[in-house]
């Protein structure tokens, strides 16, 4: 690369930690224009891959397959398939917009799969108005199973790939790699069942399935049969949100399609989340003890399992989220994986820890125990220990957790034959246990492999005690500061309504905890007045519903009808037409996503405000409402044209009626 530094992580390989490829943690970055040579012994075989671990480069396609064959393996035709995605939007822009709670991705998906926005018009159409209202009462935004809209999915870097050399009766080993930045893939095959024989490069006892889902960064080896000549059979990879798909065609001739996955039933999923979400944002599994993907709460949205009609909440007892109990379609889960050889840990002291996976979509903060990588110390472990980690996912998103430089046992009821993996997908409300032998030295990253979650801080660093200084990073303190920068990034957002009656907008410059925001209302005539407010503060709580801030409030208005000032709602003299004060206060998100703003200023004046923005009346038509104790009020309709522009009309108690265009960045 000519203009920026990069790195190379050897995903799943056992190698010296200083070659692991995490810049500023284990390895020096590869500077622009430089060449880096990696030399290490190969200690394993299987399906692996490599990718950049620098910023968001992986989203731009900096990855590839790494296949290590056994010295003495059964001869079999094979095909490598690395799955990935492409967005026309720059990855930095994707990341910035995720932190602004912007739902342009959902609007784009709606064009392909109607219903993804889950607007009020969608709810009424589906007879789910009560479900939508309950969802917002519990302070949740619309449900989505993936964060990002992608313009294309790729099979080996192509929208569709094909291999024509396979003949009838041949058994083909397909080495599947999910090289996506944030996409899960459902895998199905037009030629019949698939036999899973390896996961994350390590053999498992063969298990026959109809389909399985691949978490980000997972690899699976499957064996499929080519049923007949003169036919090409589709190996179909469908994104979890079912908006896009890509294919690998095996064989030549007439194309035999795999059955496409039908659109998700989003309001069934919303009802499920309503049932399981507490008012404080915690999740309640209702005593189901979910683990190992056996109880998939999303099954209520799958029409191929629960039927096309809205009957997914029929009483099926403890099996109501178990797809294998509800259907003849066999879906792989981790409990079905078994190592062909013993994976028992060696004797040694046990170090046990518990991690709670936390996060919220509104401000896109993802963490472990509500702390990001930069907010925690490295976790010390000793060589010779056995480390057990109990993971509970208390967030609404699934997380593929990846451990560098080690394979862990997935404790799944198989005893000494628990499967070995380096990535484990943990679904909402699941509790899963992994354990590994601490046999290495140095520092090793443990993180969510959804790229934008990792960049937001969802991870930890395991550090072996008594590790010698890393020659790759001679200034360890400086390297640690640079490594911690990723989840400290600040993001700028602005929204401005260029209307006929004035200019109305806000700007924010914020990171994971802090926010500097400014609002303005600038009338074109002196009786409309001018107002500017600025706030700086910190968000508190796991869900970040509380924002404590200090700020400045300046406003002036001349010749306003009504003469002498009126009292405000608190019985104090209303100073809304002339005010220059500092203030202290807080904003708190109430049920129905109403934001309460309560403050006291340096003149002793109390002020309160209720506001609700971005009410989705239809997928593109939005409503904003505001009222405050100064007896001001506002209502605005916006029709979203694209990710930047919207048509608007609003009525403001001071500036009157106006129409215009709104900019969102």
Task: Pin down the residues of each PLM region.
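Membrane-embedded beta-strands of outer-membrane beta-barrel proteins
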Residues: 505, 534-536, 584-586, 608-612, ...
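Outer-membrane beta-barrel "beta-signal"
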Residues: 635-639, 653-665
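Transmembrane beta-strand segments that form the barrel wall of outer-membrane beta-barrel proteins
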Residues: 490-500, 513-524, 532-534, 545-555, ...
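Outer-membrane beta-barrel translocator domains and adjoining extracellular loop/strand segments
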Residues: 21-23, 368, 416, 530-534, ...
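Histidine-centered copper-binding motifs that mark active-site loops
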Residues: 1-216, 222, 255-289, 293-295, ...
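Active/binding-pocket-proximal capping segment
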Residues: 190-204, 371-373, 394-421, 452-453, ...
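N-terminal edge beta-strand
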Residues: 149-168, 357-383
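Short, aromatic- and glycine-rich surface loops/edge beta-strands on solvent-exposed regions
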Residues: 48-54, 231-240, 444-450
